[in-house]
Structure formats: C-alpha cells, structure tokens
Design a protein with these regions (language model features):
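N-terminal nicking endonuclease/strand-transfer module with a His-rich metal-binding environment
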Residues: 1-172
Length: 172
C-alpha cells in the first residue's frame, strides 16, 4: 500500500568517527537544521555531532561488552511513498520519537526530500539520560507491525505499517 510509513532500523555506529560521518550525512542538505530531542530544538550539525559523540562515549562506558563491535547508537529512516507533506511527516516523526525516547535518550532527526519519497533520518543515542547507566536496547525479536503514528493519523489520515520497527526497552 502506498499510504504507509516504513520505519527501518538501518544500523548504528561502532566508532566516534562513524557517528560524525552519519550526522554529517543526515544534515547534508541543511547543516544548520538538525532537530534535537522532544522540543525539536534546531541545532547545527557541529553541535549535534558533539552531543552524539559524547553520548557514544558514555554508552560505551556502560556497555556490557568492552568490544569495538557493539553499536552505541541506532540509526533509523522513516519513509513514505511519494512526496508526503514535509511538515506532517516531520510532525509524525517528532511525536513518535517523543513518545518513545523523551527524557530517556537523546535523538536527532533530519528531513531529506531529494528522492521520490520524502524521508527522515534519525539517530538515537543508546546512552541513558538518567543516572541508571542502562543503555537503550532495540529488541528486534518483538516487531511491532502496527504501531500508529498519531500525527499522521490525525493530519493526513495515513495508516502506519512497517516491517522493521522494534519494541524499545532498556537493557540491563
């Protein structure tokens, strides 16, 4: 169906250098407009990269395994078929991220409209914002195939279906 949002977990960073490259890629169309956390604060790619890199090192400090193979953040793409209204798509992504991560994990998101499908690149830091030291864990075994994005339902009446969205939980 062409009226569906696809949300894919596309990877994560295993090094601070990869965090920097990913943030630069996401902000390539507008390096002064990276959306940050629940307020949707607009920050520069430099500031986003610094926060994400600091989070990377914090997540690594709390990681169960002290290896260079564990990813310290998660990358996602929210995409819709065709040129969906950019404001509605950004609002839906913002609402979904706020519901899942607000006050718990830092996240960054940027709109890309350079393909036939508008899409939003997202980076979510694994490092907890509280003092528990629990890193975020995306449980891919518990796919949630029918999560609705409230903003899209109310503003542009799209039903959300996706094949790679996962249940968010804290790892111990």
């Amino acid at each position: 169906n062409t009226n569906h949002v696809v949300i894919k977990v596309t990877g994560g960073a295993k090094s601070a250098a990869v965090v920097k490259r990913k943030m630069e890629y996401d902000a390539r169309d507008n390096p002064e407009e990276v959306h940050f956390n629940e307020a949707g604060e607009i920050i520069s790619v430099e500031k986003a990269t610094q926060i994400a890199t600091d989070d990377f090192h914090l997540a690594k400090a709390f990681a169960k395994n002290d290896t260079d193979t564990e990813k310290m953040n998660y990358n996602m793409v929210f995409s819709m078929h065709s040129k969906t209204d950019e404001k509605a798509l950004m609002g839906a992504v913002s609402d979904t991220l706020r519901e899942s991560f607000a006050g718990k994990y830092n996240y960054f998101y940027s709109l890309h409209n350079d393909t036939k499908n508008n899409h939003v690149h997202v980076t979510v830091s694994k490092a907890s914002l509280d003092s528990t030291g629990k890193n975020l864990h995306l449980d891919k075994t518990k796919l949630n195939k029918h999560t609705r994005i409230t903003k899209l339902q109310s503003e542009i009446n799209y039903c959300v279906m996706h094949n790679h969205f996962v249940k968010f939980s804290n790892s111990v």
